[in-house]
């Protein structure tokens, strides 16, 4: 019985491995390749005046890319737009979201002081009509509740003329 069980397990292993290899090839053949970037979590993009502005998480600073063809990010222009100087918001910069609101550019993001328990939402502002020009300046932290509990993943929208911020 032991020999039969051993033989069965060997055959099962060979059978599973060959099926897995075939499936992997099929998946790779049918897998869609992201035209933006192979890396970059929590991305945000906006289309404004014929250009796409794109940003994604980098943990220590915020970069902004601009392109006329969102599927050709390899030829986009990139600019470092924010490097935190305040230790309270200089670590774990997550989920930057770029928005144009009333002619000004804003990037909302979450950051902390090195302890992820202290994550808060911050916003930076650029007065320039072109976010690749001018300078983004810290507007401050956004109090999501009186206890300053954890705030991450900011997302803004307008409804009936009022601006709203969602977060988790």
Name every feature range the model reports, one short phrase each.
Residues 16-168:
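Carbohydrate-active catalytic/glycan-binding domains of CAZyme proteins
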Residues 1-24:
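Bacterial Sec-dependent N-terminal signal peptides
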